[in-house]
Regions:
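A structural signal for short, well-ordered beta-strand segments and their strand-loop junctions
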Residues: 86, 142-143, 168-172, 239-240, ...
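Short helix/strand-capping turn motifs
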Residues: 281, 285-434
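Glycine-rich flap/beta-hairpin and adjacent strands of clan AA aspartyl proteases
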Residues: 227, 231-257, 369
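Alpha-helical interaction elements in eukaryotic regulators
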Residues: 125, 153, 157-160, 236, ...
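Metal-dependent phosphate/diphosphate-handling catalytic cores characterized by acidic Asp/Glu clusters
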Residues: 1-140, 148-153, 163-164, 168, ...
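A residue-level signal for conserved active-site and pocket-lining positions in enzyme catalytic cores
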Residues: 87, 161, 240, 353
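Intrinsically disordered, low-complexity acidic Ser/Thr-rich regulatory segments
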Residues: 205-232, 317-327
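GT-A fold catalytic core of metal-dependent nucleotide-sugar glycosyltransferases
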Residues: 138-165, 249-252, 258-263
Length: 434
């Protein structure tokens, strides 16, 4: 799988260096995903030249020059074995108000080396994006409005975000909000999960002391998290897996931040650390006499479901070696069942989660056909991963045996539902053993 030298008989073969610090499982995942992408004619990237020349859309599968450069970067990487950035952003456009960026052709040439056609992008985001690209000479980017076409398979998105070097998420918030969310590493837990909340029902005196220290150190943390929670970026279906899938960092920045200061950004993993510290503060306020919750700004405004959804999805993806573990699978489905995320096209309730489950479904427009195919593929996934028949215990839900897909799931009509939770809340059939 790996090579010990920089020499390669085939300049287009991905063979990550044995000097790379990542474990073999992660290397294999990148080798498979990137090999598939670089030979896929639907995979397009935006190239930002080193010399400041006009940017160009390239097709690695048919462009030997760029493909060879990409493979070289992958094979020689010491850290994340990838070479391109992926952009996540909130469209907020409509047929009546598409916000066409007519001037994009002044900055970008399409595959045919002609100026790119107008794309939809709100005006307030354009200078931020152009500045971001200018800051990364010699880089490659996957940006949906430029690189995805009407015939691009939707199930390719999983590999695109999973295998990127870094995902930059331009979100709708004030730049100053993100700078106030940095906190010191929590000493007790990396990720928040269901067990975490229930285990802290009766905290020890030592726990309460630590919670108080967090409260004294970050008295306004809950307030700033409540402001971040208001961002529409957290409320869309597609941004769920764009946030969760990348093995590398997912870096949040304000879509209007033309200064692009590093201090005004935060990674999702660092944000989750702040979630953990915020949970400590929450427990302290709840369990301590003499502390009035009404005096803690933001205490009533931060939704626990929002925190759990982000933490569970990111943990599920980062702990890829355990992805097929029954417990992780069920917890992920439970978090989907609590999600309030929405989409414009009902089939996206399926296509927006395929990457997390490693399921491939061809692009279809009929919601009933999409859901039927999804249930078939999900059932097969549970068989192949030996999930059925497993007995697990989830805090707050009890002990149960996983039977499979619930009967009610086969009666679901995607067009009748208004959010992700409505679709996935009762998808699993479990026998209660409590």
């Amino acid at each position: 799988m790996t090579c010990d030298t920089n020499e390669s008989i085939d300049p287009y073969k991905i063979s990550i260096s044995s000097e790379n610090s990542l474990n073999d499982h992660v290397k294999q995942r990148f080798e498979r995903g990137l090999s598939a992408l670089l030979t896929d004619p639907y995979f397009l990237l935006l190239h930002v030249p080193e010399n400041g020349a006009k940017m160009q859309i390239v097709q690695p599968a048919k462009n030997s020059y760029h493909r060879e450069r990409m493979v070289k970067r992958i094979n020689e990487a010491k850290g994340i074995p990838s070479f391109y950035y992926a952009l996540s952003h909130l469209w907020k456009v409509s047929k009546d108000d598409p916000h066409l960026w007519e001037e994009i052709g002044e900055y970008v040439d399409d595959l045919d080396e002609q100026p790119a056609e107008p794309v939809s992008m709100r005006p307030e985001k354009r200078d931020t994006l152009l500045g971001l690209l200018k800051d990364h000479p010699g880089s490659y980017w996957w940006i949906d409005v430029l690189c995805a076409r009407t015939d691009t398979p939707l199930d390719i998105m999983g590999d695109i975000y999973r295998c990127c070097l870094e995902c930059i998420a331009m979100i709708d918030c004030e730049p100053s909000v993100l700078s106030k969310l940095h906190t010191e590493p929590n000493k007790r837990k990396e990720y928040i999960d269901f067990d975490w909340f229930y285990a802290m029902d009766k905290p020890s005196p030592e726990d309460l002391l630590y919670f108080k220290q967090q409260y004294d150190k970050y008295p306004e943390l809950l307030y700033h998290l409540a402001k971040l929670q208001q961002s529409e970026w957290w409320k869309r279906v597609w941004t769920w897996q764009e946030m969760a899938l990348p093995f590398g960092d997912v870096r949040l920045m304000a879509e209007t931040d033309t200064q692009r200061l590093q201090s005004n950004t935060i990674t999702v993993d660092d944000l989750i650390n702040s979630f953990t510290n915020a949970a400590d503060i929450d427990f302290y306020v709840n369990k301590t006499d003499g502390v009035d919750a009404e005096d803690v700004v933001g205490f009533r405004d931060v939704r626990g479901e929002w925190i759990l959804e982000i933490s569970q999805a990111r943990a599920f993806s980062k702990h890829d070696a355990e992805k097929n573990h029954a417990y992780q699978f069920v917890v992920l489905m439970l978090s989907l069942g609590d999600s309030t995320r929405r989409c414009m096209d009902h089939v996206d309730y399926v296509y927006g989660v395929l990457g997390m489950l490693n399921i491939k479904i061809p692009r279809m427009t009929d919601p009933k056909a999409v859901w039927k195919r999804f249930l078939s593929e999900l059932d097969n996934h549970m068989d192949m991963a030996d999930i059925k028949g497993e007995v697990i215990s989830v805090a707050g839900c009890g002990r149960g045996k996983i039977i499979g897909i619930g009967e009610s799931a086969y009666k679901i009509n995607l067009q009748e539902f208004e959010c992700m939770g409505d679709v996935y809340r009762d998808i699993l059939d479990m026998e209660n053993l409590s």
